[in-house]
């Protein structure tokens, strides 16, 4: 899929189009954002020294809706998500932001927890960018009639080089690039790409009149959409044995005869697995919120008992 990487890079770098000026959020949402910002700790780093992946203006959201992914306004986001990261909707039901991941910085660093969140964001962006490239490659391969996308890699012959040799060479090249990314993160707080901690060779960030925050939010949205899309492609391949374009044609031709429930146990199992995961995720969020509410109460009881 290497010949399509240039096209994919352009698509990945371009922010989604939006007609007219950016709409202001409703007053109720503005109030929710104000309350959210006041209830969270203030970031210590200035915008000049912060990584370019951080928002210049906290809670600078373009999505219509509140700053919290949970549909009930009475719930509050986790304390470690302070709105300074792009795409921050308070989504961390399993509290991974406080325990998951080991950033390449000293554990004794006073900003270690902030580095962890930035490191997790780098992981999301990196996987999302790969997913955007993969989605374009999957669709292009099938649109050209070259067969299912999962069968293509083993049949490729890149410039007369056997596929295995190309894979080994690619891994060695990426190992060097990953080493540079780690060094960049230690020095600047972001990893970047191809040796640059701020990878923007076409200056698309500065060229967008909507501002850098819009670009950062747009990239995170596109990354998440691409990761979900590629997951859908993979599930389709396992359930139906067909590519996304062929599946779409079959479903549009006969919606009631070609859908996830008409492919036997595999389709039913997929629905059951995703439904169970969604239920566990919401239960975990309820438990996290309940725990957050109990902490102040316990502290108040302790203070009243000692006085």
From Swiss-Prot:
GO biological process, one term: photosynthesis, light harvesting
Protein name: Chlorophyll a-b binding protein 1, chloroplastic
Residue span of region Disordered: 34-54
Function per UniProt: Component of a light-harvesting complex (LHC). The LHC functions as a light receptor, it captures and delivers excitation energy to photosystems with which it is closely associated. Functions in a far-red LHC by absorbing far-red light and promoting photosystem II (PSII) excitation, likely with entropy-driven uphill excitation energy transfer. Exhibits a typical absorption band at 671 nm (Qy band), as well as a large far-red absorption band at 706.5 together with fluorescence emission at around 713 nm (F713).
Higher taxonomy: Eukaryota, Viridiplantae, Chlorophyta, core chlorophytes, Trebouxiophyceae
Binding site for chlorophyll a 8: 208, 215, 218, 222
Co-factor binding comment: Binds 11 chlorophylls (Chl-a and Chl-b) and the 2 carotenoids violaxanthin and loroxanthin.
Binding site for chlorophyll a 5: 64, 127, 178, 181
Residues the entry annotates as binding chlorophyll a 4: 146
Compartment(s) where it occurs, according to its Swiss-Prot or TrEMBL record: Plastid, Chloroplast thylakoid membrane
Location of the transit peptide in the chain: 1-44
InterPro entries, sorted: Chloro_AB-bd_pln, Chloroa_b-bind
